[in-house]
Amino acid sequence: MARRPRAESSKEGPAHLLELVRSAVPPVHSAGHPFISAGLAVTSAGAVGQVVTGRDLRWLRRVGLLAASACAVFFRHPSRVPPTRAGVVVAPADGMICVIDSATPPAELSMGNMSLPRVSIFLSLLDVHVQRAPISGEVIAVQYQPGRFGAADLAPASTENERTSVRIRTAGGTEVVVVQIAGLLARRIVCYAHIGDKLTIGDTYGLIRFGSRLDTYLPPGTEPVVQVGQRAVAGETVLADLT
């Protein structure tokens, strides 16, 4: 589900301060827990090893802490508030809009050869890497396609790189396709959506590890309201208005 800000609290003193810190620091997606734990394990091993051997292993502890901190930042899962008006399509990912054009949806979805409006978002290593539903509706297709791990910001990535495509149909019959695309560093696509799932706009449905790209295919005739070079915020930035 979409992560939304909590209601205002009436707590005071240390409890209020702790709550402010929690609200300012984004939670971590569960997919990041093993990576953070590994970094902390290295830190612990350095501490224990220094006690046992007497050797200076501060460098090992620092490496472990640095790795754990980096993973916590990468797997952050901040709150987002999707638009409340009907008929909008929001960005499925944080990042830079790198392509706005028309293209045929992935062949594995069997949607024919008609070109559809497409908006592509490139996620750098520093962006939030959870993906969110661009629109409310039912998942009617999920297809994984193996492929290369080329640079995700280049045009061939959409057709040649490893990808997972999700096709969503709204209650009114409109369809939107969102495609998770692997990149040079992104070697693991995680998709939690399954056929028959009912998604609400802004719901978290997947994650790509370490740099990637998201392609969103819009209904025929749709005019995107964003521009190439614009920053997109997953679950909040409106890509198009279908009304």
Curated annotation (Swiss-Prot):
Pfam families noted in UniProt: PS_Dcarbxylase
Site (Cleavage (non-hydrolytic)) location in chain: G211, S212
A GO biological-process term: phosphatidylethanolamine biosynthetic process
Main location group: membrane
Keyword vocabulary terms for this entry: Cell membrane, Decarboxylase, Lipid biosynthesis, Lipid metabolism, Lyase, Membrane, Phospholipid biosynthesis, Phospholipid metabolism, Pyruvate, Zymogen
Topology class, membrane: Peripheral membrane protein
Role description: Catalyzes the formation of phosphatidylethanolamine (PtdEtn) from phosphatidylserine (PtdSer).
Family statement drawn from the similarity comment of this UniProt entry: Belongs to the phosphatidylserine decarboxylase family. PSD-A subfamily.
Protein name: Phosphatidylserine decarboxylase proenzyme
Organism name: Mycobacterium leprae (strain TN)
